[in-house]
């Protein structure tokens, strides 16, 4: 009997160890993002400071009990200073928090070995660091969508879509008002089903910022989790999750794991009489087997429940609509047409903002209260359909303060709709080419607009990992936010280059004459230097306050570039300056910007500077600028092809070197810096 009992206990111990090992294994990895916009080198001060920060966050002295802590290392105002935070899920213990943070601190250096900015998410915690201060700063980007594979049945969709947003908004308000910035809530969905929700912000946010952050991520609900029985959106500053099962640590979640009453596992009496004494032995044997087996069954049930939870998390991670670069794919951005109609009051005239590329633009309000700009493409336009798909594919991959943010899209029959962030100050041309409104644009603002556009283009060309050529940069495609910061928009013409690709050819010329580079307008060749040419024209328009097309056949001048060149060689560049800011600008900055613009519009694209070089020229007056060469491309030579006074698009026009007898060097495409 003793041997049997010991054997049973031994087996039970092994089984229990296996269960505990499963339960206490590594944290559940969700996702990580480390954009390569800024990197550090090996043995650099930044790496030393980063290791100090991660060591501090994962040290025994960190504030695991409060589930949130921050650290910094490096001198104040030093570019190598590092800031870091961790946030653990509000329902985990301090021990689980500690283990997760320690694991994440080690893992993030392996997943992001050179990037200065990174965030890594686990089911139990998040670790984030940056070269800029992040404490108290609300950020929803970069973010990740995670969805459950299973869908709600068709007859329940309408009710589910009503219940879920209301539940999440309620729990978001509850979390924002709590000191921990964490809350859970549940709501009855059907007689037999309950929706469980969890939301959380980093505790360093104000109540207002926390609620704003949660409302914004909840806004992604129709795009990330349409009809899904479970899903979540995780961002640097906040997150939400919902499921149709209790996934967080509350009494209702712990109940299935609780052991049954002790009487069910208590050994039966050992003194039952037996005629031959065998009954007693049999009872002992049964007891020796029954006790560990009963406990094992209970623990097996607990293990299955835990594994099911982990499996649900894993399924979510495996089915997320993200590409290998951590960029949200277009599959996660879709709106229902009914939601668009509701947001725009069925596309009422009072909501119309104006006309965009291939359609009209409306102001809309989503169910969470966020104001958006909704671009509705003209129905039946095959060209619009192509540009629509391209715009979604391109813009969904971009994240930069100087690019308009695509929030979603709708494709429903003939309806093709894009949903952008709402930018209150319309576009640059609305101010720049109006005699009264242009006075709002003093030189300081214009200079910041020039710099912002340059940074946005640099991101497209170099830092987005994709090398994107916009091909239609012009004043009407530069939006201005509430602080008059520029945001490049309208990516319907944009093209993505491969890693080693430096140029491309096309017979379908798209864009706007006057902003096109000669090699593109004549030969159909485009590269990053095509956008540099357009940028140069934009800079000249910002300085002069005049449209490029307004110079057509005026005093024998073909275009704005020719007019500027004439005054430049006459050593009278300040005559170009817009009268609206005369006497209120920095002379050296204006002259330098004119000089840079003339370098951008040179005929030979290989002699044009890169956007990287342009920003160096703008920010360092010690850099000597090369002497610009005259552009050989005049708008008046294209009169037979299309009257540039219309400012129209060339999207339906095909051009080759034979159709326009202008002299342009076929080999004038430069080689882009490899990345």
From Swiss-Prot:
Residues 26-281 are extracellular. Residues 638-661 are annotated as: Disordered. ATP binds at residues 353-361, 375. Its main location: membrane. Residues 28-134, 140-247 form the Gnk2-homologous domain. Keywords: ATP-binding, Glycoprotein, Kinase, Membrane, Nucleotide-binding, Phosphoprotein, Receptor, Repeat, Serine/threonine-protein kinase, Signal, Transferase, Transmembrane, Transmembrane helix. One of its GO terms (cellular component) is membrane. This is Cysteine-rich receptor-like protein kinase 25. It comes from Arabidopsis thaliana. The gene is CRK25.
